[in-house]
A protein has these predicted regions:
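Acidic-and-aromatic substrate-binding clefts and catalytic sites of carbohydrate-active enzymes
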Residues: 24-28, 50-59, 122-126, 153-154, ...
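Active-site groove signature of glycoside hydrolases
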Residues: 105-125
Length: 312
């Protein structure tokens, strides 16, 4: 496994991370334990969850699975999204953050969170309040690093500039939606992160499975797959996208790799990507994703792939 620095920090995370939004739901406790142990054996040390995944059950499942293994992982979780029906059960206020960090620590059965991420921007809470609270959590030792998620470039820039002026800890990472067919991040987020050394953590790297190549043009989606009923996956099922996947699948296979490995390797070729967060519901998914860390695209290969993606 390859390890990379998490943005402008000394923390090293595995190039392939483990996404756990289905843990505690579709993935039961037995499978969670198997997947987590298997991921650690493969060298994956970065695990990402959130307080809202499966209404907190993802964190609970991880807390059980990671007993005796905390020294082998870097745990990331998130706050801001609604966790209840009360008026203060959401947002980036000091009240909600302080309440929820304690709840996450209880569910995870640990005394600290390695990377605490703001799940989205909060228009209702003064940024100063949010950042001061996060700085206090780092000072207390309950949180070691902070990150953002689903932020625009101007929001990330404003937050880190304010943190610099006030002497508070900055966001070291940004977790946003980014893959071969979702490239909006290349307009502003990626240039900003490259310039200011903020680590990028792409999520949904396989476009819900479409970038594995398992969905075939003109064929029904496999029974039980997301492609059967997920609008997110189905929106990628266009002739133009099938053309690209078919070409890239053949290109990858000529080099002894799969389309899924190429989708990960392409993200890892981006300069500021620290870790690609790959969700898994089976150990075999983790094993397949981990192989991508060993494939470093050359500049020429990267250009060839971009040529296909750009329709050249």
């Amino acid at each position: 496994m390859q390890y990379r620095l998490l943005g402008n920090s000394g923390l090293r995370v595995s190039a392939i991370g483990l996404g756990t939004n289905q843990f505690g739901g579709k993935v039961d406790q037995l499978d969670t334990a198997q997947i987590v142990s298997g991921a650690i054996d493969l060298g994956i040390n970065f695990i990402d969850t959130a307080d809202i995944y499966q209404q907190g059950r993802s964190e609970e499942a991880l807390g059980v699975a990671l007993k005796g293994k905390w020294d082998k992982v870097i745990m990331a979780t998130k706050v801001v999204s609604p966790t209840g029906d009360g008026p203060n059960d959401k947002g980036a206020s000091r009240y909600h953050i302080m309440q929820n960090v304690e709840a996450s620590l209880r569910r995870l059965q640990t005394d600290h969170i390695d990377l605490y991420q703001m799940h989205r921007w909060d228009n209702d809470t003064p940024l100063e309040e949010t950042l001061r609270t996060l700085d206090d959590l780092v000072s207390s030792g309950k949180v070691r690093y902070i990150g953002a998620s689903n932020y625009a470039a101007w929001q990330l820039a404003r937050a880190n500039l304010l943190a610099e002026v006030r002497g508070w800890v900055p966001f070291v990472s940004i977790q946003n939606h980014y893959h071969m067919f979702e490239r909006e991040q290349e307009r502003e987020i990626i240039p900003f992160c490259n310039a200011h050394n903020v680590g990028i953590l792409p999520f949904f790297p396989l476009a819900g499975g479409f970038l594995t190549g398992k969905y075939k043009r003109g064929e029904a989606a496999p029974a039980g797959s997301r492609g059967e009923n997920s609008p997110y996956v189905q929106k990628y099922m266009t002739d133009a996208n099938y053309d690209k996947v078919e070409k890239l699948t053949a290109w990858a296979e000529e080099r002894g790799h799969t389309m899924g490995e190429l989708a990960h390797a392409w993200l890892l070729a981006q300069p500021s990507v620290s870790s690609v967060i790959s969700g898994a519901t089976k150990l075999s998914h983790v094993q397949a994703n981990a192989k991508a860390a060993d494939w470093a695209l050359t500049a020429e290969e990267f250009a060839e792939v971009n040529g296909v993606l750009n329709g050249e």
